[in-house]
Amino acid sequence: MAAVVFSLRRSGPVFRLPGVLQVCRGAQTAAAAAPASQAEARIKKFAIYRWDPDKPGDKPRMQTYEVDLNECGSMVLDALIKIKNEMDPTLTFRRSCREGICGSCAMNINGGNTLACTVRIDTNLSKVSKIYPLPHMYVVKDLVPDLSNFYAQYKSIEPYLKKKDESQEGKEQYLQSIEDRDKLDGLYECILCACCSTSCPSYWWNADKYLGPAVLMQAYRWMIDSRDDYTEERLAKLQDPFSLYRCHTIMNCTRTCPKGLNPGKAIAEIKKMMATYKERAASV
């Protein structure tokens, strides 16, 4: 009895005798690709910072792993996930979106603060890729930094719309012109990954007092929002010698930002606003 086999061609069903091997186009493609999987291994070494606070006496160290790039995705985060899934389940790091949106996988890779999900693996097999947690932060475990202080500073600037007349809150929209909305471009895109703040020497030295580039850029974002009524009050909170003025325009923040933003410029704009604010305050 003849069998009915559906072909990938548009000519409809094709009758074939039983026992005759049928090879679909996808199988042919897989067969053609087979030699590639047998290519010579490309072994890449990753030296990763390790420290486990739950192990008494454990000291920070670098642990080396070898990954075949032929069997790994192209990004550093792909390598970390492969290491954790297939070699060492104790390796700890943060990650979520895998597309440069959430900021979770911020770490120091080959000397620069960046996102592991958006940085390609250096394919030079003679070089060891070195991965550390964000610098000058307390470490929770391995590549996980403690961001408690960073988030507390962000909370302190009240990063939300504030209105002095709240009678219409929830009843109508707070409209904004196209021109005023355009002023927020390059500011609202910040994902709070902390790459910029942890690359700033001033923040290393005064993290308990200096707000740092990420938080200051968000402070500026709300200061210039035409819908916000608390610009003067926001400026007043930065009057002390440390919150704002520890910025020495080193510009590491702008160089390292994985989103291509310019926190240094935002801080400079706040300083300009502060000058006019002081003049207004003195005249009162």
Curated annotation (Swiss-Prot):
Residues engaged in binding a ubiquinone: 205
One of the GO BP terms on file: tricarboxylic acid cycle
Occurrences of domain 4Fe-4S ferredoxin-type (ranges): 180-210
Pathway involvement of the protein, from the record: Carbohydrate metabolism; tricarboxylic acid cycle; fumarate from succinate (eukaryal route): step 1/1
First and last residue of the signal peptide: none
Comment on bound cofactor: Binds 1 [2Fe-2S] cluster. Binds 1 [3Fe-4S] cluster.
Binding site for [4Fe-4S] cluster: 190, 193, 196, 257
Ranges where the 2Fe-2S ferredoxin-type domain occurs: 44-137
Record bears the keyword Transport: yes
UniProt transit peptide range: 1-26
Cofactor: [2Fe-2S] cluster; [3Fe-4S] cluster; [4Fe-4S] cluster
Highest taxon, organism lineage: Eukaryota
Record Pfam families: Fer2_3, Fer4_17
GO cellular component: mitochondrial inner membrane; respiratory chain complex II (succinate dehydrogenase)
UniProt EC number: 1.3.5.1, 1.1.5.-
This protein's UniProt keywords: 2Fe-2S, 3Fe-4S, 4Fe-4S, Electron transport, Iron, Iron-sulfur, Membrane, Metal-binding, Mitochondrion, Mitochondrion inner membrane, Oxidoreductase, Transit peptide, Transport, Tricarboxylic acid cycle
Ligand binding ([2Fe-2S] cluster): 97, 102, 105, 117
NCBIfam families in alphabetical order: dhsB, PRK05950.1
Family: Belongs to the succinate dehydrogenase/fumarate reductase iron-sulfur protein family.
Role this protein plays: Iron-sulfur protein (IP) subunit of the succinate dehydrogenase complex (mitochondrial respiratory chain complex II), responsible for transferring electrons from succinate to ubiquinone (coenzyme Q). SDH also oxidizes malate to the non-canonical enol form of oxaloacetate, enol-oxaloacetate. Enol-oxaloacetate, which is a potent inhibitor of the succinate dehydrogenase activity, is further isomerized into keto-oxaloacetate.
Protein name according to UniProt: Succinate dehydrogenase [ubiquinone] iron-sulfur subunit, mitochondrial
UniProt source species: Xenopus tropicalis (Western clawed frog)
Gene: sdhb
